[in-house]
Regions:
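Short, often N-terminal, low-complexity regions
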Residues: 5-14
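Non-catalytic structural scaffold of enzyme domains
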Residues: 14-15, 20-278
Length: 278
């Protein structure tokens, strides 16, 4: 019995072999929009010679309010798009898609997947107040994977807050808007009153809010996101599979079904990237 493949009846193992025989094939990433570019940046900085293909499914953002079945369906569609572009590894640069769909993706495709999960572990281990906050989507906080992670750290009080509206504002290019500021204050102030000393960002869009978060939070509260950990894991998996591309200039292609200007603005025109519609 062979796993599902978008390439017809060929055995997936054959394609798996081809992916890792061609180290110059790209790293594929997908997210429900522009947020996963925070993960892409971390990967690009750690692995500057790697070609990348990033898929921003902004039309369907946010994933966090969708059902598990919808999230799995969209994640499979995104995966197959990246496989058609010969991705040698796929980074699910979306917390909601990771916590709801990565198990299904790994069961359905032989390409390696890297997921992004809220960094509860380092926050819980290092917290001095034994109280940490997590800001995430509804889809992440209600997922089985997230709740299993929370159960491990029962000695730590974890204050969960759904970031309603944050992804939508980021996707609309309203990072520094009064609406954003108002929402962040309403979400963070109760956590501060509860004496948290760590805030875990449980959505790949949220690192773009760090400048605002730092203005609102007392300086003793540390902010943790997962970008660097995901980049290191991508490096480790490629290294183990002898799949690293170690020289030359990288090509980076970003596909979006949303407003490419938001994508360009969030990358701050700092990177050499080609933008395409899909």
């Amino acid at each position: 019995k062979h796993k599902h493949t978008p390439f017809g009846n060929f055995q997936m193992e054959y394609f798996f072999y081809l992916w890792f025989m061609t180290n110059d094939n790209p790293i594929g990433l997908f997210d429900s929009g522009v947020g996963g570019t925070s993960i892409w940046k971390a990967i690009h900085e750690l692995l500057p010679y790697e070609d990348t293909i990033y898929l921003a499914d902004s039309k369907n953002a946010p994933y966090g309010l969708k059902s598990k079945d919808e999230i799995i369906s969209l994640s499979k569609k995104n995966t197959e798009f990246l496989l058609e572009k010969n991705a040698k590894i796929i980074v699910v640069a979306c917390n909601t898609a990771t916590t709801n769909a990565i198990k299904e993706l790994r069961a359905s495709y032989s390409v390696p997947f890297i997921g992004i999960e809220p960094a509860i572990k380092p926050a819980a281990i290092h917290s001095k107040t034994q109280k940490i906050g997590i800001l995430a989507t509804k889809g992440t906080l209600s997922s089985e994977l997230f709740n299993k992670a929370v159960e491990i750290y029962q000695d730590t009080i974890i204050i969960e807050q759904v970031g309603y509206g944050l992804v939508e504002l980021i996707e609309d290019g309203k990072l520094n808007s009064p609406e954003m500021n108002q929402l962040l204050h309403s979400y963070l102030e109760p956590m501060v009153k509860e004496d948290i000393d760590y805030l875990v960002l449980g959505c790949s869009h949220y690192p773009y809010l760090i400048p605002q978060l730092k203005k609102i939070l007392p300086s003793n509260i540390k902010i943790i996101d997962s970008g660097e950990a995901v980049a290191r894991q991508t490096l480790n998996v490629l290294n183990a599979k002898s799949g690293l591309h170690k020289e030359g200039k990288s090509k980076n292609i970003f596909y979006s079904n949303g407003n490419p200007k938001v994508l360009e603005a969030i990358l701050n025109h700092q990177y050499k990237v080609a933008f395409k519609d899909f």
